[in-house]
């Protein structure tokens, strides 16, 4: 989201500072599918949540590469969807359960017709049947942190992107960070969202000063110094996070 403005800001800062990109050492990098490019669309939330689901399956040894264009096509059938096509990771989960999902190679452009069937390992499925094997109902939980609502209770985020009025479990920020860290260290898929952008968290790194960062899988192609990855400091996680989606059982794990 807001990609053009972001790129202009990055270009201006780089032109003024002329500084090389910051160096990061990877402490943990989870498996992921190839970096994709959302183009000029504001559908980063689709790419981020699908990337989290893909990483989750890769951690099981199951290779899944999903089509963001299929979900973008299904938005045409959603009367509540804003013209911007913005949404949240929780929105993506709802849409998968409603419309299903197909593999990336089955639909590589939003301008192509949506496939009626998915062919996998010699078997034929509807998109809805395939979706049930990719993302079980209630498999993921949506989390947030706001001091304006009671902690450990569910709340509806009052933001335009939450046009399906999904509910989020409200946690103290330190707890949200700890749960996110646990999920990443256990190789689970995690979708992270600010008010402006969404990415998948795929690992942990540190800079030359030893400061910790999350490794982020972006959806802006492989141009740039980090070849499609980005880095989010733990401090920025605390100040910028709007929501996180991750496997439900991670929240209730004992350690």
Regions found by a protein language model. Name each.
Residues 2-7:
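Sec-dependent signal peptide recognition
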Residues 13-15:
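C-terminal motif of bacterial Sec signal peptides marking the signal peptidase cleavage site
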Residues 33, 117-255:
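Active-site signature of cysteine proteases
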Residues 38-53, 82-91, 197:
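Active-site nucleophilic cysteine motif
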Residues 43-46, 70-73, 92-95, 103-106, ...:
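Structural recognition of the beta-strand scaffold that forms the well-ordered cores
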Residues 47, 51-60, 95-102, 182-183, ...:
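Structured segments of extracytoplasmic/periplasmic soluble domains
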Residues 64-130:
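Papain-like cysteine protease catalytic cores
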């Amino acid at each position: 989201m807001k990609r053009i403005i972001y790129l202009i800001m990055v270009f201006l800062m780089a032109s003024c500072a002329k500084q090389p990109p910051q160096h990061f050492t990877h402490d943990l990098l989870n498996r992921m599918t190839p970096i994709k490019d959302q183009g000029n669309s504001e559908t980063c939330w689709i790419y981020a949540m699908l990337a989290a689901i893909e990483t989750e399956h890769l951690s099981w040894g199951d290779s899944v590469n999903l089509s963001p264009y299929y979900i973008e096509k299904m938005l045409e059938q959603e009367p509540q969807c804003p013209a911007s096509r913005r949404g949240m990771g929780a929105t993506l989960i709802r849409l998968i359960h409603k419309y299903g999902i197909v593999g990336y190679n089955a639909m590589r452009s939003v301008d192509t017709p949506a496939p009626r069937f998915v062919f996998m390992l010699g078997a034929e499925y509807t998109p809805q049947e395939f979706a049930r094997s990719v993302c079980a109902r209630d498999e993921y939980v949506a989390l947030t942190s706001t001091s304006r609502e009671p902690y450990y209770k569910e709340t509806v985020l009052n933001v335009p992107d939450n046009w399906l009025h999904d509910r989020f479990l409200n946690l103290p920020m330190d707890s949200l960070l700890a749960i996110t860290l646990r999920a990443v260290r256990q190789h689970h898929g995690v979708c992270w969202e600010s008010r402006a952008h969404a990415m998948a968290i795929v690992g942990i790194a540190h800079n030359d000063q030893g400061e910790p960062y999350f490794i982020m899988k972006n959806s802006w192609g492989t141009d740039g110094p980090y070849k499609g990855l980005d880095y989010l400091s733990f401090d920025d996680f605390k100040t910028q996070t709007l929501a996180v989606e991750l496997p439900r059982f991670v929240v209730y794990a004992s350690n």
